[in-house]
UniProtKB/Swiss-Prot annotation:
<dbReference type="Pfam" id="PF00790">
    <property type="entry name" value="VHS"/>
</dbReference>
<comment type="function">
    <text>Component of the ESCRT-0 complex which is the sorting receptor for ubiquitinated cargo proteins at the multivesicular body (MVB) and recruits ESCRT-I to the MVB outer membrane.</text>
</comment>
<comment type="similarity">
    <text>Belongs to the VPS27 family.</text>
</comment>
<dbReference type="InterPro" id="IPR017073">
    <property type="entry name" value="HGS/VPS27"/>
</dbReference>
<dbReference type="Pfam" id="PF02809">
    <property type="entry name" value="UIM"/>
</dbReference>
<feature type="compositionally biased region" description="Polar residues">
    <location>
        <begin position="592"/>
        <end position="609"/>
    </location>
</feature>
<dbReference type="InterPro" id="IPR000306">
    <property type="entry name" value="Znf_FYVE"/>
</dbReference>
<feature type="region of interest" description="Disordered">
    <location>
        <begin position="229"/>
        <end position="265"/>
    </location>
</feature>
<keyword id="KW-0479">Metal-binding</keyword>
<feature type="compositionally biased region" description="Polar residues">
    <location>
        <begin position="568"/>
        <end position="578"/>
    </location>
</feature>
<feature type="compositionally biased region" description="Low complexity">
    <location>
        <begin position="660"/>
        <end position="685"/>
    </location>
</feature>
<dbReference type="GO" id="GO:0006623">
    <property type="term" value="P:protein targeting to vacuole"/>
</dbReference>
<feature type="zinc finger region" description="FYVE-type; degenerate">
    <location>
        <begin position="168"/>
        <end position="228"/>
    </location>
</feature>
<dbReference type="GO" id="GO:0043328">
    <property type="term" value="P:protein transport to vacuole involved in ubiquitin-dependent protein catabolic process via the multivesicular body sorting pathway"/>
</dbReference>
<dbReference type="InterPro" id="IPR008942">
    <property type="entry name" value="ENTH_VHS"/>
</dbReference>
<dbReference type="InterPro" id="IPR017455">
    <property type="entry name" value="Znf_FYVE-rel"/>
</dbReference>
<dbReference type="GO" id="GO:0032266">
    <property type="term" value="F:phosphatidylinositol-3-phosphate binding"/>
</dbReference>
Length: 737
């Protein structure tokens, strides 16, 4: 609003005030025009107050009286913002100074009386208003000082009340459509309410005489509708029922308000009016062959005429057409009901055949809304929403809304039935969904039970097996029904097998026995009769007359067969046993170690002190068992027995093979691989050695403690030492025997 105030406007106001306060007769029209200028805030209220004060301080009493009358008119019509300037100390002290002036500056008695009258009336009208309280203080002060006021006249406070343009309100968005202001979407203020609007919401312009604004200024759409509605009511133009908005009679020239047709054309969009017209035409065209002649020309006949008057016949014809359309719609609904009832009866009786039912489609349910009815409902909802921003009486002057309301009101039972059917369908679908969910849940449970049952059966057949067998070592056992070994040399292997003959695994296939179980363990006995459970149960050979075809011979190489009646000595003379086979059991096919601990300098490193203690105890037990009578095998031995020779025979039969000199000891480590690759040329069965042992019992040869055979374990094979261990001393006396 500061843009309104300019020096040009102030100069124009000064000229008008000078003209109104001239010494001629008072011009009331000019006074009201000046008050409207002040009220419209075209000029600053302070500048207007100072212009009036200047004219009041004039030396001409007539000018002073005219200025006082003009000031009173402006106080009563200038608005609250001008009243605040009149009640200021600057203006009131100027009036008091005129009252107290003495000497040449004394004012005229009429001017003096007029000033006291105005102060008294203004103070009476401003009672109870805080912003105008200084006028009352001046009035009371003058009363105390003894100034004689004229008789008091009761003046209502409404005398000084006048509408003025409100203060402008600032905002970042449009206060109607909430669109943000940008560089292109500029901000505009409504002169009627002072709010912020954008361009599309404040395109209207109207003069505001109630605010003292006589020229057309910018207003928003809401204020425009309110002001034009008030103006149409004030003009006394009766509302007209027409297809579209018709113009009202022309206003007198003195009225600056726009006619009603301008408001109507701007208030509603053209497309909305076209939609209304098309909807009504469609309703009429869908009736049962009913086409009225006025209906075809209804849109053109109901358009506003140039003179602003609509034909009354068009209104009557429109009402008749609407009645006919409603009647046709009701008749169509009744016919649909009858068709639906007939279709239901036909389905119940079962008389309709598939051939006859194919060409004729079932009619729609009478409770279903047609697309046209749904469109009318949506259109009516849109119109009602648009009416929220229209003046209160707009709904009474819109025949289209009334017609839509009547037609939609007839659809309420149909809509209620549609809603009920939809709810029943919804409940049915919910019930079916619950049943389906239950069935699916039962089916899933059944599948889970079947799967679990199948898995359990499969686990019994293949996955739930008993514990795995013990991992076989290098000397697995034979069949449990193998015949026992003959001779006292096999007594050591009748018990549990030593754990040293197997690789240490997670499962202990061979438990560790105590040392007391090895009753007749010595160097010779361990070689002559190994335990029957040291060999894998691959095949159980048949009892034959010779040893060669046995299955165990396939593991340890081809061995010569001897008849049972051959003397042991003859076999011993023909045999030249290898010391590697005499001192250690034959290895498994996957084992390359076959030398004796005493003959191999590298192998003697692998025996611990525990093995030495074990050997000493076994030698003592062997001496006790050798005193007992030994049995000679009366029948050929079981081919399942070990093919190793029994070294318990007289030592003179194999003296050439046992003596070893220190010079020959270093050459022994190369024999194990050769012994494993090539079998010996001649080797005696163990029963011949047993027979020779019974004939002659030589003194027992005590081997050194370090020569005891403790078996092979996984811990017994570290990296071969690079130094030659100390060899035990061999007794020469035993060699001479």
């Amino acid at each position: 609003m500061m843009g309104w105030w300019s020096s040009g406007a102030n100069n124009a106001l000064d000229e008008q005030i000078d003209k109104a306060t001239s010494s001629s007769l008072e011009d009331i029209a000019l006074n009201l025009e000046i008050s409207d200028i002040i009220r419209s805030k075209t000029v600053q209220p302070k500048e207007a107050m100072r212009s009036l004060k200047k004219r009041i301080n004039n030396k001409n009493p007539n000018t002073q009286l005219s200025a006082l009358n003009l000031t009173d008119t402006c106080v009563k019509n200038g608005g609250a913002h001008f009243l605040a300037e009149i009640a200021s100390r600057e203006f009131m002290e100027s009036l008091v100074s005129l009252l107290k002036a003495v000497g040449p500056g004394t004012v005229n008695a009429e001017v003096r009386a007029k000033i006291l009258e105005l102060i008294q009336s203004w103070a009476t009208a401003a009672e109870g208003r805080y912003e105008l309280g200084y006028i009352g203080e001046v009035y009371k002060t003058l009363q105390r000082e003894g100034y004689q006021f004229p008789p008091r006249v009761t003046v209502a406070s409404s005398m000084i009340d006048s509408n003025a343009p409100p203060e402008w309100v600032d905002s970042d968005v449009c206060m109607r459509c909430r669109t943000a202001f940008t560089f292109t979407n500029r901000k505009h203020h409504c002169r009627n309410c002072g709010n912020c609007f954008d361009q599309q919401c404040s395109t209207k312009s109207l003069p505001l005489p109630h605010l003292g604004i006589l020229q057309a200024v910018r207003v928003d759409d809401g204020c425009y509708a309110k002001l034009t509605d008030k103006s149409s009511k004030a003009s006394g133009a009766p509302p007209e029922r027409s297809f579209t908005y018709s113009s009202s009679p022309a206003k007198p020239k003195g009225s600056s308000m726009q006619p009603r047709n301008a408001r109507v054309d701007d208030g509603f969009d053209e497309d909305l009016k076209k939609a209304l017209a098309m909807s009504l035409e469609e309703v009429k065209s869908h009736s049962r062959g009913y086409v009225s002649s006025p209906a075809a020309n209804g849109v053109t006949s109901n358009q506003p005429k140039p003179n602003g008057h609509a034909a009354p016949k068009a209104v009557e014809e429109e009402d008749e057409d609407l009645k006919a359309a409603i009647a046709a719609s009701l008749a169509d609904m009744e016919e649909q009901k009858k068709q639906h009832a007939a279709a239901l009866k036909q389905q119940a009786s079962g008389a309709a055949s598939s051939s006859s039912a194919a060409p004729s489609a079932l009619p729609k349910n009478d409770y279903e809304l047609t697309p046209l009815e749904a469109e009318n409902i949506n259109l009516f909802s849109t119109l009602v929403d648009r009416l929220q921003t229209q003046p209160p009486g707009t709904i009474l002057r819109e025949p289209q809304i009334q017609e839509l309301y009547d037609s939609i009101g007839a659809l309420r039972p149909k809509l209620a039935r549609t809603y009920g059917e939809t709810m029943s369908k919804h409940d049915t679908l919910l019930d079916l969904h619950a049943r389906l969910s239950t069935v699916v849940r039962y089916y899933d449970r059944m599948l889970e039970e079947r799967l679990s049952k199948a898995y359990s059966q499969h686990s019994i057949g293949g996955y739930n097996l008993p514990p795995p067998r013990q991992a076989p070592g290098p000397y697995p056992s034979l069949q449990p029904n193998a015949p026992p070994a003959a001779g006292p040399a096999e007594n050591f292997y009748t018990g549990e097998q030593q754990q040293e003959y197997s690789h240490p695994t997670t499962h202990q296939p061979y438990p560790q026995p105590t040392l007391a179980q090895y009753g007749a363990y010595d160097k010779r006995g361990s070689v002559s009769a190994p335990s029957s459970n040291q060999y894998p149960p691959q095949q159980v050979p048949q009892h034959t007359g010779n040893w060669g075809p046995a299955s165990s011979a396939q593991q340890y190489g081809q061995q010569p067969s001897y008849p049972p009646n051959e003397p042991p000595q003859t076999a011993q003379l023909q045999q030249t046993p290898n010391p590697a086979h005499l001192s250690a059991p034959a290895p498994a096919p996957n084992d390359s170690i076959g030398t004796t601990p005493t003959a191999d300098p590298s192998a003697s490193f692998y025996f611990s002190s525990q093995a030495q203690q074990q050997q000493q105890q076994q030698q003592q037990q062997q001496q006790q068992q050798q005193q007992q009578p030994q049995q000679v095998p009366s029948s050929p031995p079981d081919p399942n027995m070990s093919p190793y020779p029994n070294l318990a025979q007289p030592l003179h039969s194999y003296q050439p093979s046992l003596p070893q000199t220190p010079a020959s000891i270093p050459a022994q480590p190369s024999q194990p691989q050769q012994a494993h690759q090539a079998p010996p040329q001649a080797q005696q069965p163990y029963w011949q050695h047993s027979a020779a042992q019974q004939t002659q019992l030589p003194p027992v040869w005590q081997p050194p403690p370090s020569a005891a055979y403790a078996g092979y374990t996984q811990e017994s094979f570290p990296s071969a030492p690079h130094h030659a261990p100390k060899q035990p001393v061999v007794e020469e006396s035993l060699i001479d025997l």
